[in-house]
Amino acid sequence: MADQSLLHSPINPHFFQPILTESRTHLNIPVAFFSKHVEGRNNQNKTVTLRSDASDKTWLVKMDGLKLTDGWEDFAFAHDLRTGDIVVFRLEGEMVFHVTALGPSCCEIQYHTSSHNINDDDRNDQINIASRNSSRVKKNPRKKVESSLDHSRFVAKVSAWCLSNDRLYIPLSFARLNGLNKINSKKIYLQNEEGRSWKLVLRHDKSGMQTFVQSGWRRFCSENGIRQGQYTFKLVRKSAPPVIRLCRAKAKPKQRSVAEYSSDHSCFEGSVTPSSLRNDLLYLPRSFVNSNRLDKRCSEIVLKNEQGVKWPLVLKRFKSVTYLPKGWTSFCQVNRIKAGDSFKFKLVGTWKKPVLSLCPTQSNNHKTPLECSEGNKSEESEEDCLEVKKKKYWSRCRASVENMDDDQTNIGNSSRKKRVSKNPREKVESSSDHSSFVGSVNPSSLYKDQLYLPRNFVSSNFLDKRCSEIVLKNERGEKRTLVLKHFKKDLTFLKKGWTSFCQVNRIKAGDSFKFKLVGTWNKPVLSLCPTETNYHKTPLACSEGNKSEESEEEGTEDKNTSQDCLEVKKRKYWSTCRASAENIDDDQTNIGNSSKEKRVKKNPVKKAESSSDHSSFVANVTASSLNYDRLYLPLSFVSSNGLDKMNGKEIVLLNEEGLSWKFNLKYNQAGKHTYVRPGWSRFCDANGMSQGQQFTFKLVQKHGPPVMYLSLSEHRPKSESSSHRSYFVGSVTASSIKKDKLYLWKSFVSSNGLDKGCKKIILKNKWGREWKLVLKHYKSNCFTIIKRGWTSFCQGNGLKAGDSFKFKLVGTGEKPVLSLCPAESSHEKIPLECPEGIDDVNSLSSNPSSGDDSSRSEESEEENMEDKNISQDCLETKKRKYCSSSSYSQNRFVTLTLTRSAFQTYKLVSFFNNYASRLS
């Protein structure tokens, strides 16, 4: 207790307070100390300054009467104050306090920082509060703190945030011990293991007590193959300019650098980084470029895979850096090279257009590139195939293949190994008689709705001169007419119908096919032959399809008449059904308010929120939130924490590493919803949050500005769709109710085949009532939504914004059925509608005469089609149905049959009047 005399010195007034559980957000000042030394001063309700021996930083804390409020939580967090500790405040000036922290045993807490503590350096790397990483050690002269004497090394954590913001944070302890915190806006050099140097800028932020390097960190990581993880750096020169060298950790396997090359100089090795795929760039090693003189004479270069397919790329130079832009990503996608895979290129041609040949490695020797339907053995056909690949993959492959690659890998993995021929050049080859050809379906052809035909097949059958249409026929004889297009006398392809043909015949990406030419007149016919992948498949049945195809065979002029008629009938029928159902829902909502209140009172514990803790909520990353760059907050969370009264104020989001993002808090009074913006999309990208995932946010500070903490590990709900693809779990958002839309997960849609020809979907609650909604697919943005009825479904089942739900797919086909399962927030809710519903009313009848009355009512409906003013009678009928007293016996049931004419004319009144008069 060397400082005991200072603590009890009568010269400086002081007081002490124990740290309790509620001391996390504020600390009380003793009344005697406040009245003697603080009360009566001009700044008693202003800010006090806190200092400590742990660091040179000062903290500004607001004094609100007898409490230290805003800023105290940061001070306690930085000094690792725990329940049971004691803090001593010594007044040293005008509202300036020196704070000393004591442990539960009244021993002073000693703070120290270890330069080799990986966790400490990780936090120092990105957390603004430096002393939070300090360890607490009791002051005991017999037990000294063991720490390493080598302060020339530090471990840096490379995160996605560091790469996107082009900066590397240096631990504060390392910067202080080596004097880097006193250097600002000076040059610093980073060296890789081979001694190559990169010039960066060293900066020091005094306000946040941070030291970091920038302006070149992203390029250093890209050229040295540094991905997300932990890397060791060593300071090899302290004098200006400082030099820091990259050292690979012994415990981690040696990472292969992009600049690594063999002693031969004709080849070089590297690894694919996420940034190279994202930026579509491949940097070439300087020694490889110089030794082969690629830096002077070349403007183009050709990449060739193991099968001989070539990709011409542009060779760019910027100062001393040589790289390949615009084409590297498509090359990796076609050859199935992913981030983290290693590669090796060999220079096989040194003329004006050099050729880099991809050599087999351990990571790609078992991979087969995406097949090309125009492939051939000759060099000329390879060039044609190259042109096709450029048009098929370069234009939209970057946007489509990333979303489709996972599905393609899962769908066609097992079958693709069997389909690949022994000679990889023979991907799509015409048969010897030129009347048939074999190919495979790739994602680009489905996405662009095009199928390229082999050149020799087209020329041998004279399809390039006289035809503008072609007919595809499946194994059942059903036909579909497509447009035949010719491009520059070299390319021939089918469009406007290829995707729908594959959907109907259940041909997916990765499946192989074989077509045979069976007709060579003005409209040739290609017949689909059975293969290993589709001989067991049955085409989707279409009730109107057979009629339309027969009409095609009978007369080509009326080929689409029945299909168009069917679509018109469907559109007319569903529009009337939706209008009537929405009107009935509104009436039932107004009528059944009192009865609903009685039902809800039976279980008053169940609120809209499943948890009583209003300091946290679960956020869904949806497509709309990413597109509109905003995050909607649940209404209960906002109202309970007073965030609806902070319109236009600033709010801070913290991730698990302590990095902060500032947003604006907006409250829409008309829609009564609160959201944060802008920057939500950037926040999701930096923290690896993707569409369809759920994350927990906790409000850790209510006082301005509010602070919400993101927990990535605490709440990642195990979506039952991942383990069982027939389930879909989500929560109701304010935007989904307002826009009458529900976004479905891509994995749920693709795994259950909902994107294959489905235009309608049925939602069913646990009482059996059904809602018919529209299922809409957006191929350009790769998402699927349910619309025109989602809001009425939520209203009918008592679902509000913030409630969670769970659907199970119980029926497939043209009209799949999603059944609502009981969830935590909705299993006690009773829908506004009775189990008999309005879409399907099937009840047991105890009175046989009711069936006769029903038939009479239907006959009267057919006879009186022009009566329109029955809304009041229908409303009175529903009032009897929902507000009826218990005097009606339970055995009085009736069977109702809802016909299309009933929906169109709103007529059930005749039967209801007869039934009501019979009851009276």
UniProtKB/Swiss-Prot annotation:
- Annotated region Disordered: the residues are 405-438, 540-562, 585-614, 842-870
| Any Pfam family the entry gives | B3
The entry's DNA-binding region: 12-105, 153-250, 267-361, 436-531, 616-714, 727-823
| Ranges annotated as biased composition (Basic and acidic residues) | 423-432
**UniProt-listed Gene3D superfamilies:** DNA-binding pseudobarrel domain
Where is the protein situated, by its record's location annotation? Nucleus
- Keywords, A to Z? DNA-binding, Nucleus, Repeat, Transcription, Transcription regulation
**Tree of life domain:** Eukaryota
Q: Which GO terms describe its cellular component?
A: chloroplast; nucleus
Q: This chain belongs to which protein, by name?
A: B3 domain-containing protein REM17
What is the taxonomic lineage of the source species? Eukaryota, Viridiplantae, Streptophyta, Embryophyta, Tracheophyta
